[in-house]
Amino acid sequence: MLSIQNLHAGVDGKEILKGINLEVKAGEVHAIMGPNGAGKSTLSSVVAGNENFEVTKGDILLNGESLLEDAPEERAHKGIFMSFQYPVEIPGISVTNFIKTAINESRKAQGLPEMPAAELLKKIREKAALLEINPNFLSRSLNQGFSGGEKKRNEIFQMAMLEPKVAILDETDSGLDIDALRIVANGVNKLKSSDNAVIVITHYQRLLDYIVPDYVHVLHDGKIVKSGTKELALELEQKGYDWLK
């Protein structure tokens, strides 16, 4: 599904990613861990198409098709979703209107007509119920006045509505108390299927108690230095990252 091949990328002439290779298949959950400054958020930004970063070598393929020439919105239309560590506030635009616009822009890019209002409303209600989201939440301005947990739940709701092929969750556990973390993780688990894949980027093992990965990769100094299963995350929790240098 997603194939990252010998990816080198950086910003302002400084190389940050130094040859990343990663194969993510449909139905899989991959966790990417590593110390601060390892390149985790850079990797997610580069896959999503952040234009502040320059790819100098390698490729990113989605279902065999290179994404490198695609703008961020084109990658989103093709099925790449990224939840941000610090979601932006958009006063005056409700959660529902934002979702409506995002879905219809994606459909337009695929040559499809706008989703009928009744169908959209039905889908919103179904996904909100699935994720235990209060309907009043959907009429609020996007992220304005939201708590950390509400912002993250909103992003998982967007993921539910957009149904991406690959969802990249960047530090989704950042700033969440244990109850909010559990709610967000349960939402992600409910959205997993054999048709999509999830990449979880995290500094801490605790998120992986709730979103259990098939594979764990350790990023250090712009390279994947070790890969394994859930047990690797537990080992990192006990030993830290220094033993991998």
Feature names for model-found ranges:
Residues 2-4, 17-19:
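Conserved structural motif at the start of ABC-family nucleotide-binding domains
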Residues 82, 86, 92-108, 123:
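Q-loop/switch helix immediately C-terminal to the Walker
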Residues 215, 219, 223-245:
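Conserved beta-strand-loop-alpha-helix hinge in the C-terminal portion
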